A protein has these predicted regions:
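Short linear motifs embedded in intrinsically disordered, charge-biased segments
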Residues: 1-126
Length: 126
């Protein structure tokens, strides 16, 4: 996810939370305080958890599975000038670093879930 997309998502979320609470910027109440009142978490954290959950799912697949092969593919050809786009795997690696996860821990489903979702919270399974 691009930084611009992340900022747009956060901005929209803040607007919606304020609208749900009937609060304007003139009331000088922080969005964090409103989120705590409603007991909701930031949408960027939900996206991060989903990304890490999908990574664990892919890592537990067999090595010859096409989904796993697609995550490891490297495109051959000329490389353009400048810094390249951040890949999905780079994003996952930075998320894992933030949470103190290692790639090998994705094999242990219970351990990775505890680290991703926290000790007490469980994901909503429909």
């Amino acid at each position: 996810m691009k930084v611009e997309d992340k900022q747009r998502l956060e901005r929209t979320e803040k607007m919606m939370v304020r609208w749900m609470c009937g609060v304007t910027l003139k009331n000088r109440i922080t969005s964090e305080e409103l989120r705590n009142r409603l007991s909701i978490e930031a949408v960027t954290e939900i996206v991060r958890r989903g990304r890490l959950r999908w990574f664990g799912h892919v890592e537990r697949k067999a090595d010859n599975d096409w989904v796993k092969k697609c995550t490891k593919v490297e495109v051959v050809g000329k490389v353009g000038r400048g810094r390249g786009r951040k890949t999905w795997l780079q994003c996952v690696n930075s998320d894992m670093k933030d949470l103190g996860l290692r790639v090998g821990e994705a094999q242990d489903r219970q351990l990775s879930r505890r680290k991703i979702f926290g000790e007490t919270s469980e994901p909503c399974l429909h």
